[in-house]
């Protein structure tokens, strides 16, 4: 029996080691995805910070909004934590002040009044939109270059008929002269024909010899 147990024990230990290795491999495979999720969460602003910015924008007070006003407006959101939400708002306000997203108008710490730093908020949007605005005029320049040869061709086409108009005028003049010449020739031929007709109009009288009377 002891021999059989000795033979069976290494098998069980080997199976246990294999299971441990597979578990360790699974945890190692899952760890990079967890790290990525954590890095994304760190890069993105917290939802309470976004809530603070939105509430201050909604209130729109010139002299800044206090923590009490921000809290009363922010707690209307359905996902707001009613127990710890106020402390989360304090931390997010401090972070936004350090970030230069918020300007502290009055007081010190989280007990003062806060206002949005519009230069930073609007400047970020302008910087993002600047490359797109810079690249936008490029296609219009290409279109203008493409349109320029067409315009030059149309100008050349306009100039060519101008040259061709002079021969037309000359041809008209020649045509008028030709008409005049033809008219003069027709008159001359008509006059000559009239003379011939007049000459032919005289009747030819047969001459009678004098000796036969």
UniProtKB/Swiss-Prot annotation:
Biased segments, Basic residues type: 33-44
UniProt keyword annotation of Repeat present: no
GO biological process annotation, one example: nucleosome assembly
Domain of life assignment: Eukaryota
Role summary: Histones H1 are necessary for the condensation of nucleosome chains into higher-order structures.
Gene: H1-10
Compositional bias per record (Low complexity), positions renumbered to this chain: 130-154, 202-213
GO cellular component, one term: chromosome
Protein's name according to its UniProt entry: Histone H1.10
Similarity comment text for this entry: Belongs to the histone H1/H5 family.
Organism listed in the record: Homo sapiens (Human)
Positions bearing Citrulline: 62
């Amino acid at each position: 029996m002891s021999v059989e147990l000795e033979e069976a024990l290494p098998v069980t230990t080997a199976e246990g080691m294999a299971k441990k290795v597979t578990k360790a491999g699974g945890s190692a495979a899952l760890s990079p995805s967890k790290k990525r999720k954590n890095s994304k969460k760190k890069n993105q602003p917290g939802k309470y910070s976004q809530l603070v910015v939105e509430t201050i924008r909604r209130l729109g007070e010139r002299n800044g909004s206090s923590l009490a006003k921000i809290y009363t407006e922010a707690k209307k959101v359905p996902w707001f934590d009613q127990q710890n939400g106020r402390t989360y708002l304090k931390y997010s306000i401090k972070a936004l002040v350090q970030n230069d997203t918020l300007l502290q108008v009055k007081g010190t710490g989280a007990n003062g009044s806060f206002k949005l730093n519009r230069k930073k908020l609007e400047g970020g949007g302008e910087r993002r939109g600047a490359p797109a605005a810079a690249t936008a005029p490029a296609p219009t320049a290409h279109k203008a270059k493409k349109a320029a040869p067409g315009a030059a061709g149309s100008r050349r086409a306009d100039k060519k008929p101008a040259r061709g108009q002079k021969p037309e005028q000359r041809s008209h003049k020649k045509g008028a002269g030709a008409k005049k010449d033809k008219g003069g020739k027709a008159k001359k031929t008509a006059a000559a024909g009239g003379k011939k007709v007049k000459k032919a109009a005289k009747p030819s009288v047969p001459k009678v010899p004098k000796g036969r009377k």
